[in-house]
Every structure is written in C-alpha cells, then in structure tokens.
Amino acid sequence: MGMRMMFVVFLLVVFASSVTLDRASYGRYASPVDRASALIAQAILRDCCSNPPCAHNNPDCR
C-alpha cells in the first residue's frame, strides 16, 4: 500500500470511531454507568425536594 492509501484508511478509521463515540452519548446507546449516574442524581434531587430546607436552597426544586 502506498502512503496516500494508508492515510485514507487512517482517516476512515478515525471518522468511523468518532461517529461511534458520538452515538454513545445518546439515550439507548448510553453506557450503564451514565444511566446509573442519572438515576442516582434523580433520587437525590427527589429526596432533597421533599425536604423543605433543602428544597429552599436548591433551584432545581422550584
């Protein structure tokens, strides 16, 4: 293979991996760790919003 062809193959691999990584940040393609983090954050916020002193200091509860 010539240098030009190797460069084109390299660019195709980089492009394909960047598209795959971009998809990983969306809903059903999200990793289990991301989903777990979101669920934990929702649980903490729900508990905080049910507590009046915490809800008063947290703008997400309003």
From Swiss-Prot:
The lineage of its organism: Eukaryota, Metazoa, Spiralia, Lophotrochozoa, Mollusca. Transmembrane segments: none annotated. Residues 1-18 form the signal peptide. Disulfide bonds join 48-54, 49-61. Pfam families: Toxin_8. It is found in: Secreted. Its main location: secreted. InterPro entries: Conotoxin_a-typ, Conotoxin_a-typ_CS. The cysteine framework is I (CC-C-C). Alpha4/6 pattern. Belongs to the conotoxin A superfamily. Keywords: Acetylcholine receptor inhibiting toxin, Disulfide bond, Neurotoxin, Postsynaptic neurotoxin, Secreted, Signal, Toxin. Alpha-conotoxins act on postsynaptic membranes, they bind to the nicotinic acetylcholine receptors (nAChR) and thus inhibit them. This toxin selectively inhibits nicotinic acetylcholine receptor (nAChR) alpha-3-beta-2 subtype (IC(50)=845.5 nM). This is Alpha-conotoxin ViIA. Negative results: does not inhibit alpha-2-beta-2, alpha-2-beta-4, alpha-3-beta-4, alpha-4-beta-2, alpha-4-beta-4, alpha-7 and alpha-9-alpha-10. In addition, it does not target dorsal root ganglion sodium (Nav), potassium (Kv) and calcium (Cav) ion channels. Residues 19-45 form a propeptide. Expressed by the venom duct.
